[in-house]
């Protein structure tokens, strides 16, 4: 973290392991809160944010989620079809918690596998709308009681839960009612 903070990019680490809606303990930032955070007045979120930084000049905040895998993002990635929600959703959470503007969320691939690269998502109106849309899709699935496993082609190759689902989940997914999966399939088309 020291090297990251000394990178000369104008960002200074401010909060580490900032949790919300989780049990408070010594492993989490002192600014953590025991209650979940409500985003957009309707979505209750819980989690832990790896790093919150403050820009030394503009004083805005930036949220960072550390990743250990390969960087599979593209320049246009915002939520990556619902697979990469942290930059946007964690930014919205930090805005709600601090009542301060968050300029961006980013993924920092902090291992050799990820090439020590980062991907930044500016928290502009389009990113906000896209993140909230993803939450709406998830909320509808919960409301309808339909959160069926429906992996995208090749997704099981990188999934930690493959032993739970078994080797044939992709094949089973092709037999599911596409009408019930319409929200999920539309979400996957978002950048």
Regions from the PLM with identified roles:
Residues 1-191:
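RecB-family 4Fe-4S metal-dependent nuclease core
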């Amino acid at each position: 973290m020291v090297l990251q903070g000394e990178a000369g990019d104008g960002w200074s680490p401010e909060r580490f392991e900032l949790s919300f809606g989780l049990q408070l303990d010594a492993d989490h930032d002192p600014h953590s809160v025991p209650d979940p955070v409500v985003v957009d007045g309707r979505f209750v979120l819980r989690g832990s944010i790896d790093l919150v930084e403050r820009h030394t000049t503009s004083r805005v905040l930036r949220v960072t989620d550390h990743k250990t895998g390969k960087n599979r993002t593209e320049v246009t990635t915002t939520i990556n079809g619902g697979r990469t929600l942290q930059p946007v959703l964690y930014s919205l959470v930090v805005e709600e918690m601090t009542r301060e503007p968050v300029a961006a969320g980013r993924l920092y691939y902090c291992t050799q596998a990820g090439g020590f690269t980062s991907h930044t998502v500016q928290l502009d109106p389009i990113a906000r709308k896209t993140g909230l849309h993803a939450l709406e899709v998830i909320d509808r699935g919960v409301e309808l009681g339909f959160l069926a496993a429906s992996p995208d082609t090749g997704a099981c190759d990188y999934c930690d839960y493959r032993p739970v689902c078994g080797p044939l989940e992709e094949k089973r997914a092709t037999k599911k009612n596409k009408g019930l999966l319409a929200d999920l399939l539309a979400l996957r088309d978002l950048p």
